[in-house]
Amino acid sequence: MPDTMTRPINRPGDVGPLPTDHPVVVQGKVGVLLVNLGTPDGTDYWSMRRYLSEFLSDPRVIEVPQPIWQLILQGPILTFRPSKSGRAYKKIWTKEGSPLLLYTMRQAEALKARIGSDHLLVDFAMNYGNPSIPSKLAKLKAQGCDRICVIPLYPQYSATTTASVCDRTFKALEKMRWQPAMRTAASFHDQPVYIDALANSISTHLEDLEFTPDRVLMSYHGIPKAYFDKGDPYHCQCHKTTRLVAEQLGWADDFAITTFQSRFGPTQWLQPYTDKTLEALPSEGVKNLVVVSPAFISDCLETLEELAMEGEEEFMEAGGEAYSVVPCLNDSPAAIDVIEDIVRRETAGWAN
């Protein structure tokens, strides 16, 4: 073909000459996409309904036949639950929006400032709501990323969370003719950098308290027990995180209590339940309590409202005297250390 009819592809990532009328193709970059659970666009009824419909329609979250479940979900549940959930979100909503969205955005910005470059691009998405995984994958690809590493920001693996992110990631790829190479990151429930960060945040919080806790409650988001029975490793990974943190801080074997929160529906979930434990502890002599939420790298509805507000009310009404919740790592330098460690490990061979 004559030289006048061809031109080179944009470098890096040269794949040879292209016709002169071919669209510009940018390649050779590596993308990192941080993904957390998601958040509604607002606290109003319809924003909440859209978000809950997407979230609760995920077959990874609710493992029942979808035709039957959708009749229940789109009927009574989404008639009443959006208003209730909206009231809860209003308690924690900021001028900048959802705390989870804000912290995830800041994490991406801080990570970009540390390790981002023209070759390594960093962005974030939400598994439910906005910004969506498909939109951010398309953006990274348009920016020249032919290799993308997706980082689910869940310390402990569960099919309800990590696997759902992977499902939605690869579902988005189905619509791409020219797909980027993909990697998904493993859980980090026992990674030393995460255990160090979590232990240090707890230690610092305890030092600043005006009381000495009788026990520390490690509250993780729950999953139905049936999922555990089918082989979900989440329960085991939660207990391992608790054990490693307790060992790091030199706690006695029974000082840390592992519980599970946020159960939904009539079925049995992982136990012991956080709310029932909070109600029972004062009668067992535990009057001063500190609560940690190791399943969440960022503060969200479950930590700011369910634990910090409802949890304190439950504990104090049952006879507790002092109660404090350790903030999540959020966008602290320690949080970025954890995420950077994951990214460097998972992009080995792609990014130097």
Question: Where are each of the predicted segments found?
Answer:
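Active-site-proximal alpha-helix that buttresses catalytic centers in soluble enzyme cores
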Residues: P2-N352
